[in-house]
Amino acid sequence: MSNSQANAGISGSTVADEPIQHHPSLAAGPVSASCPAATPPSQSTQQPPPHIVSASTADAGSSAAVGVGVVAGSEGVNLDSSPRESGDDSEDESEILEESPCGRWLKRREEVDQRDVPGIDCVHLAMDTEEGVEVVWNEVQYASLQELKSQEEKMRQVFDNLLQLDHQNIVKFHRYWTDTQQAERPRVVFITEYMSSGSLKQFLKRTKRNAKRLPLESWRRWCTQILSALSYLHSCSPPIIHGNLTCDSIFIQHNGLVKIGSVVPDAVHYSVRRGRERERERERGAHYFQAPEYGAADQLTAALDIYAFGMCALEMAALEIQPSNSESTAINEETIQRTIFSLENDLQRDLIRKCLNPQPQDRPSANDLLFHPLLFEVHSLKLLTAHCLVFSPANRTMFSETAFDGLMQRYYQPDVVMAQLRLAGGQERQYRLADVSGADKLEKFVEDVKYGVYPLITYSGKKPPNFRSRAASPERADSVKSATPEPVDTESRRIVNMMCSVKIKEDSNDITMTILLRMDDKMNRQLTCQVNENDTAADLTSELVRLGFVHLDDQDKIQVLLEETLKAGVMSDGAGAESSGAGVTTTATMAALEQLERNWSISSDADKQGTAVMYVPQEQQNADGDVDVEHSGTTSN
């Protein structure tokens, strides 16, 4: 395909990712290929939005949302009262102030309380028009264009690396760009996942108000998730250092899922003003999460994060670190040691002391801490089975999300026989699901495993990316809305089901190809482009991968689908029937496409309206030669 054809073809195609079970009003509209779909937020983060007040009227009772490196949570939060007192106020907060250069992100007037996170100047709630969900619009403002230029390369490196992160315990980073429209106030804007359930600091304050002690099991589960995220960051090449880990920058969901932000503040923005703020923080004792060597070291190291984690673990265990006396708010070494001594569990004290070792070279790594006697455990067969069920590649590709949920419901009934025991007298005894204690919580347990509440720490986790420099510069917005395209991302989601159709227009004989993709996160994607007799399936597929619409590992599978569609609709006798406008549709499931190297059979059925082609592995055909629709999918014109 020529460049001109590419521009008029897939690069100009209609793209829509929309949730299957969302309200139609939330369905995504068409989006230009210049702003490719980013990985949608995990299902666990799409909670009911909190009550948020404008920053101009925010007080100690306001709740918060967060992006990467943006702290959510303020003291005395009241989750039961709404600060919105009238419909007019709500309409004002929903007013759109500006949009991203690609038009996908819409910044609202509604601001989010960010507390004292270094480097972040302004945080607004925003709408992702493609996914139909709320996100966070973060702004870092620079004193001058010269200052931005001096930090741009370092900023680019950090943000380019953050775009590649994919961990269920790390707040998702979606996009960034620079804006130099106002030379006297240049800025960097980045879009992050919206966390609505508040910070860990908020939760600890509420727990302390209720005079409750945090159970050791909850403490262990939180520490495991935080260390899993830190181990992932530190295992990147080069390593990513958090640099601002506190209980204010750790966020907890309603189901116990913990996430941390991942921006290094000094790499985002550093100026004289930031230095003065840091000195004020030291004066009021807010620096106690920072290691003794912080500021003196030439380069941030993983040991800094380990020290900060130790302070977080101590605050989680004690609920609060009280100052030495009521007249001072400073937290010193004596206060820390007294708080550690107040803990009852010896192993808990040992783990925290190792993290707070004054010598950075003697502190354990995040991975080493996962094997500490207090955190390490031999995973139960129940947990291993749940991970196999949820994350096994075979299970993720064999069924769509809906089919998988239906399969779970089929076997999750009280009268389902789980085991059968033959007794000595020849009698048989059946054990049903209703006989198992805690069976009513099994479905929730599997859901928690899916969302990352129970990671496997004794096995190698998800391999972090090896970062490389990007050839493209970050997007620079010269106006509120610019035609400059953003850097194209690679698609990280896999295809579960796919369908392709071609249709010839009666008046012009132009061939329109439409590709429907169902991704592994319940999202549908529709791609439409014009093709001609010179276009090949290989060229079309390569362009889909290059533009970030298809995962690289799915390239061969979708190429076969396109080849069969073009063959059936254009090169065969069925092309004549196409002129009637009926079209040709080809459908394939990932389960079938995964077996390309095996023995295939292609079932074709042509009628007067058009032709339909479906891929079906032989083992999925029954004795009569019919297709098991539940496994292979359906075909329609």
Swiss-Prot record:
Sequence segments annotated as region (Disordered): 1-60, 74-99, 465-489, 617-637
GO BP annotations listed: endoplasmic reticulum to Golgi vesicle-mediated transport; intestinal stem cell homeostasis; intracellular signal transduction; protein secretion; regulation of cell population proliferation; regulation of cell size
Residues found modified as Phosphothreonine: 484
Residue spans of biased composition, Polar residues class: 1-14
Subcellular location: Cytoplasm, Cell cortex
Entry keyword annotation includes RNA-binding: no
Domain Protein kinase: 109-375
Pfam families: PK_Tyr_Ser-Thr
InterPro entries named among the record's database cross-references: Kinase-like_dom_sf, Prot_kinase_dom, Ser-Thr/Tyr_kinase_cat_dom, WNK_Ser-Thr_kinase
Biased composition (Low complexity): 36-46
GO cellular component entries: cell cortex; cytoplasm; cytosol; endomembrane system; Golgi apparatus
Major place of residence: cytoplasm
Biased composition (Acidic residues): 88-98
Phosphoserine modified-residue sites: 473, 479, 482
GO molecular function: ATP binding; protein homodimerization activity
UniProt KW keywords: Cytoplasm, Phosphoprotein
Keyword Methyltransferase listed: no
Domain description: The protein kinase domain is predicted to be catalytically inactive.
PANTHER family: SERINE/THREONINE-PROTEIN KINASE WNK WITH NO LYSINE -RELATED (PTHR13902)
Function, in words: May play a role in subcellular trafficking between the endoplasmic reticulum and Golgi apparatus.
Family: Belongs to the protein kinase superfamily. Ser/Thr protein kinase family.
Name listed for the protein in its UniProt record: Nuclear receptor-binding protein homolog
